[in-house]
Structures are given as C-alpha cells and as structure tokens.
C-alpha cells in the first residue's frame, strides 16, 4: 500500500524547514479538539480554559472569585452575616423579621426600591442623569471694564487706587500757603497781598505827603530846623545864642532899644498893639473851628498825639519811621518787590508757580552684584536672580541672569515651564505679591559704588514699562543658553526665556514676567545657570 504524501503548508521553506517543530507523527494519536493538546510541542497536555486552571502541583482546579468558595470539593456561595441556604439550596434571609429599612431619597413599595428625583435629575432608561439648564448668554464687558482670559479687570488712572478691594480716589495733600476747600485749591494770602485776575499782587499803600517842617528826600523824612535849633545824634537841641545883636524890627540907638513897627502894628501908650487885620481864610486841609485852626486828615491818615501819621491796615506796619509790608511764610522781599519763596522742584513761569521736571539723568534699579536666593517657586526659594533695569533717555534696558539652587540646580528635558514675576505699584516700588519680592536686595544703584539703596524715590517710576505703550500685555522671546561656558555653547544645552510686559496681576500697576520654556530641547540633565539676557522697552513718564 502506497503511503499518501502529506500536503505541505503554504509558508513551507525548503531551505530552512526547521523554524517551528511539526506535530508528532508517533503514537499515541489524539484529537486536540477534545481536551488534549501539545504544550509544548511533543508533550501531551490537558487543554483547559478559565475558570479551570492548574494548581502548583499540576492538578486541574477551579478558580473562584469573590462570593464563591470550595467546600469538600463542592462549589458553593460564600454567605455573609444575615444570609443562609434553605433546604431547597436557595439563598435566603436568615431572619425575615430583620428586613432592610430605607431613608430618603430611597423608597420601598412592596418589593420595589425606588429613588426619588428632584430638580436637575431624571431617569433615562434606568440610568440616573443630571439635567443642566440652558446656559445664559456670555457676559459682555464695555469700558472701563476689560476682560483678559478669564479675568475681568478695571484699569486705573494715576488719580485712583484700590484699597481693601474698594475703588477710591487717591487723596491729594496740600501744604501752606496752599489750602483745599471742598473741590477747590486756593492760595492763602496775608496782609499786603491780594489776588486780582487769578494773579498774586501786593497791595500798595496810599501815597504819603509831608508838610513843613517835615521834608522828604528819596526814602527819608527829615525835620527842617531854624536858628537856635540843631539836630545832634538824632535829637533836636537848642544852640547857644550868639552875642546879642539887634536886627529889624528891633533897633538900638545908644542905650535905647526900640521896635520898628510896620503895617498892622503900632505902639500906643508904650504898648505894642495890633491893628485889626483883614479877615483870614483857610483852604483845605486846614479848617477853622471857633478860634482854633485844625488839619483835616483824609483816608489813610490820622492825627495821633498831635502828630500826623499814616493809618496802616492788615499787611502794613511802621518800621523805623517808614511804612513796610508784612509778609508771611512762603514770601520774601527782593529788589523792593514781594516774591514767593520756591523750594526744590518749583519755578515761576508766566507769573504762576509750577513744578519743574527733574533732569533726565540715567537711573539704575538692581538686585546688587551678588543677590540672595530671591526667586520663589511654590513658596520655596530656589532661584538666585540678578536683575538690572537702566533708564537712559526714553528706553529701559533689562540685564538679567538666573542660577538654580536646591531642586532647581539641575534641570532635565522633562522640566515643566515656570515663571518668575516682579510686581510693582504705581510709584515703581517692588511689591511682595510676586515671586521675586526680596526688597532687601532691590533698590537704586549709586554712581560711585556697587551697593543697593533701598529707600524709594519718585524717579523709580521712570524704569517701569510705559502703560500707554504697553496697554495690553506684550512679550519678547530670546534663546537662553544654560551653563554655556562649561558646555562651550552646545545647542542641546539651550532653552527659551520669554519676557512678558505688564501682564495684569492682582493690584500691581506694572509687571515683568520671566517665563522659561522648551526644556525638552535639552539632551540631558544640565546646570540651570543662564546666559546674561538683555531686553529693551519704552520707559514710563514721570
């Protein structure tokens, strides 16, 4: 009998026919579809599938899950407290009197337990589902409210501020001689000054006139003296008479002295008598009252102690025989004129007082040459930040470098992005709300040394980003090498640093955000020691 040749498989390789072992052609023969198999090839084994498996001793066993157990070779349910098996092999409650109780929102009706549904819930094909109301239309914001991302903010002008979460007007203080009343600012003027047509002017005293024996020469008043009188050491004295001589109307004839009389006089019975003169008339300011002649004093003059004096009002006084104006604080005399005293930062332009602009000198704010660990991430100081802001003309130049410490000393390609933020108030002073907030190592750099002057100045504002130019956040990105000197500038040792200008942040007026990106360009762990980064932006106005 001729043996039938077995057909070869389609993938049979006559060159390398031994890749996989073939089935055994030796007895015993078996049907692999009736519980037996070759595993491994050439070895007869029992073909089992879950829940049947083999024990550690090679015996066939039944795998059991939770709630099932084997007891003396029999599979049975594992019963918990309160459950038993009755005589019919059914699982039942051990004590029917101990039934389950239900509380809201569960309710039992005969043999059915149901769930009470309130608003916002519904039963959909036996599944509890939450129903959501139709969402309202999106909110629209109009100026002065602005929306950036998920934040609504209110831009503030210089005259406004936020205190304890409330919007208010920034109070303005005024020093004498300026005074604020209600909504007006006025200049308090003392005696001798007045405001005419919104200009400060001096009140001129009335002109003074002098009658003999008083006479005025330039700015001096003098007393004219006649014979027998003189002024010595500022006092009026009588001079000794010269030898007795007689002049008209006296006449000496030998030892007789006679009086020559003229019109209006005569000698009668050895007595000098007056002949009635014609009636006298008096012109203003002289007036005759009965037998007295008096001087009538007009406005600005008065008679005191028998003397004619000038009446002085507020702002005028008698000083060393002259009348002068009395000036208060903030005023002075210069070249016989009353002028306002001006302190630093004030000048007079077109007859009005105005503040002067400070000279445009370069200003530098910095952390000092060797700052402390002043950068915080998750409230932990881990970055040593050197930052220098220099205002020259209208531009501010930023020089910065960063060195990691602790957990950020070495960074890897899986490092997450992170930001270091400086927040400033409306005066350009560093706030404590950012994560670069060490005010002990932030201030102004003097010209002559490398110290930090932390005392704030009104010029610090000049180093801030111009809010009108950067009314919305602006950004610039720069390639940043890490440990460049040690790795000789290898391109696989660089990341990106993005400077974000004036990104809204809390109550801060100005912000500078240094964001470090693209760590996945690193080829491995690298020392976080950045190159010196340089940025430029337009500075704020004074």
From Swiss-Prot:
GO biological process, one term: adhesion receptor-mediated virion attachment to host cell
One GO cellular component term: host cell nucleus
Localization (cell): Virion; Host nucleus
Region called Disordered, residue ranges: 1-24
Superkingdom field: Viruses
Gene3D superfamilies reported for this sequence: 6.20.10.20, Adenovirus pIV-related, attachment domain, reovirus attachment protein sigma1, domain 1
Triggers of expression: Expressed in the late phase of the viral replicative cycle.
InterPro entries: Adeno_fibre, Adeno_fibre_knob, Adenobir_fibre_prot_rpt/shaft, Adenovirus_pIV-like_att, Attachment_protein_shaft_sf
Keyword Aminoacyl-tRNA synthetase: no
Cytoplasm among keywords: no
Record keywords: Capsid protein, Host nucleus, Host-virus interaction, Late protein, Viral attachment to host adhesion receptor, Viral attachment to host cell, Virion, Virus entry into host cell
Pfam families, A to Z: Adeno_knob (PF00541), Adeno_shaft (PF00608)
Domains as described in the record: The tail region anchors the fiber to penton base capsomers, whereas the shaft, built from several repeated motifs, allows the knob to protrude from the virion.
Family membership noted in the UniProt record: Belongs to the adenoviridae fiber family.
Comment field (misc): All late proteins expressed from the major late promoter are produced by alternative splicing and alternative polyadenylation of the same gene giving rise to non-overlapping ORFs. A leader sequence is present in the N-terminus of all these mRNAs and is recognized by the viral shutoff protein to provide expression although conventional translation via ribosome scanning from the cap has been shut off in the host cell.
Complex formation: Homotrimer. Interacts (via N-terminal tail region) with pentons.
Its job: Forms spikes that protrude from each vertex of the icosahedral capsid. Interacts with host receptor to provide virion initial attachment to target cell. Fiber proteins are shed during virus entry, when virus is still at the cell surface.
Protein name as annotated: Fiber protein
Organism whose genome encodes this protein: Canine adenovirus serotype 2 (strain Toronto A 26-61)
